[in-house]
């Protein structure tokens, strides 16, 4: 039942992603639900990506094992990010034309500037 509630709260950018959100860890889903309720509507961009690599490093991304999600927040993004940074999750924000938020399993906090080709600057 919780999964159905979770999926109904969030906007998925494609039907294919509807299935992939089910693989996210409960801790990540809980953060998304909290943000959606308290800060603004959450729009999922990406969850599971087979063979995903971290830009500029070649290391395996948390997305490759469905341990991370990229999303937009409809409003109050800065307040939501401040709250997320106080939580025990990985949080990455992006600039340089990519303005989504990344949340994953882990504790890393950062901000990256990535160009349209996925290369860090």
Can you say where each PLM-predicted feature lies in the sequence?
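Acidic/histidine-rich, surface-exposed loop or edge segments in extracytoplasmic proteins
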Residues: 18-20, 63-64
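Extended, low-complexity, intrinsically disordered C-terminal regulatory tails
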Residues: 27-57
